[in-house]
């Protein structure tokens, strides 16, 4: 009898976890499919890397299949073709992963700013978290919230 009750509780638990994950996934996919949102970074942990890169990210912006990252004390933006104050022009490509559908990555691959990658994991309540890489080095871990640009 104990085994049957344990088995039933395990099934109920797994169904509940599946429902929560499906809900999380649906919200994340809504943001990704709409393709217009800003991640307002609320908390960061800067990590000193071997190449001595530390930067404080303040905002990640996604519009369709392009994305950008604004950071630093003077809101510098790293984009696809230049790095200057408050500029949002042609930004890096936004990609999604089949393994992690609630996650996006923004990859910047041009001669001047090559190697930067932002990963963003989206939760149900509009919260998100992620890491910013320079090539394979993590130099910033962040938590934030999403603002939908369509509203």
What spans do the regions from the language model cover?
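Small side chains
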Residues: 10-13, 67, 130, 144
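N-terminal glycine/threonine-rich, aromatic-flanked beta-hairpin/loop signature
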Residues: 51-92, 130-133
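Exposed acidic/polar residues on beta-strands and adjacent loops within beta-sheet cores, strongest
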Residues: 29, 75-102, 112-114, 146-151
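Beta-sheet ligand-binding and adhesion/scaffold domains
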Residues: 99-151
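Bacterial Sec-dependent N-terminal signal peptides
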Residues: 1-25
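Tryptophan-anchored aromatic micro-motifs
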Residues: 21-53
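Extracellular/luminal recognition modules and glycoprotein regions
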Residues: 23-27, 52-64, 70, 97-98, ...
């Amino acid at each position: 009898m104990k085994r049957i009750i344990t088995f039933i509780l395990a099934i109920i638990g797994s169904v509940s976890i599946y429902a929560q994950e499906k809900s999380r996934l649906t919200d994340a996919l809504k943001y990704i499919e709409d393709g217009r949102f800003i991640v307002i970074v609320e908390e960061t942990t800067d990590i000193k890397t071997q190449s001595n890169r530390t930067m404080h990210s303040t905002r990640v912006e996604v519009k369709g299949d392009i994305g950008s990252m604004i950071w630093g004390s003077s809101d510098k933006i790293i984009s696809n073709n230049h790095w200057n104050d408050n500029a949002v022009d042609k930004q890096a490509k936004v990609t999604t992963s089949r393994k992690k559908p609630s996650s996006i990555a923004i990859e910047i691959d041009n001669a001047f700013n090559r190697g930067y990658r932002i990963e963003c994991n989206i939760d149900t309540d509009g919260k998100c978290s992620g890491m910013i890489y320079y090539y394979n080095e993590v130099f910033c871990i962040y938590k934030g919230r999403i603002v939908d640009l369509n509203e």
